[in-house]
Amino acid sequence: MITELPDTTTKAIAAELAHARERHSLATGRVLTLLVAIDDSREDSIDETLATLRDASFEHPARVLVLISGDSEADTRLDAQVLVATDAGASEVVVMRLYGELTGHMGAVVTPLLLPDTPVVACWPQKAPKHPAGTQLGRIAQRRITNLRRGTNGVTLKQLTDGYEHGDSDMMWSRITPWRGIVASALDRHPGTRVHSAEIAGAAGDPSVDLAAGWLASSLGVDVTRCE
């Protein structure tokens, strides 16, 4: 079920969430609040993000607050959609489009909608900030997730590393998990063998290759060279 709330307030959104739980007898066992910041307002991009969140919700039911930054020069307005039941998987999703001064006050917008006594996770599936923990959403969240590989604003792995704080992670780490498992298994087969150096190769321009190289260097204590 999708409920449209044009030119609304966070109080009205919270009331609609409560009414939706009553109407649909929804379970309240949400394990976290997930904040998702999107700058791209294309509907196909939003639909792709919502589909991913819906699939993930069956393992991790959450309250998902999606924030889409609109025109900061427009009149201040908050438009929202509340998605529950089949349209939200096992979660409850609020899609909020921010205009005017609200684009610079994301933290204030989401605060009244946070679930009590549950962790808060912030995610930037498109444009990764250089210092996630320094953003308004990042200061609220205990965990911060970026997706540098799909970044569209030119932030590099080096910049993300320089701005790292405890609780930051990037989706690249999950992507290289199978590869790390294979490497660790191969090294375990020869426990007495000393590694003096390593070379790593991968797709040109893919930052996950540099992340894998850093993991090798840290784990083995040797110099690692990236081969193009």
What are these regions (language model features)?
Residues 46-49, 106-107, 132-134, 208-212:
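A short acidic (Asp/Glu
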Residues 1-122:
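An N-terminal, globular interaction/scaffold subdomain
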Residues 31, 90-91, 117, 140-142, ...:
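A broad structural signal for short, well-ordered beta-strand segments within beta-sheet-rich domains
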Residues 52-56, 110-112, 136-139, 213-221:
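Short, solvent-exposed amphipathic alpha-helical segments in soluble enzyme
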Residues 92-184:
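Internal, hydrophobic cores of structured domains that mediate oligomerization or house catalytic pockets
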Residues 75-78, 132-133, 156-157, 207-211:
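Short, solvent-exposed polar/charged micro-motifs at secondary-structure junctions
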Residues 157-228:
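A contiguous, surface-oriented mixed alpha/beta subdomain in the mid-to-C-terminal portion of proteins
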Residues 63-72, 123-125, 147-151, 223-228:
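A generic structural motif
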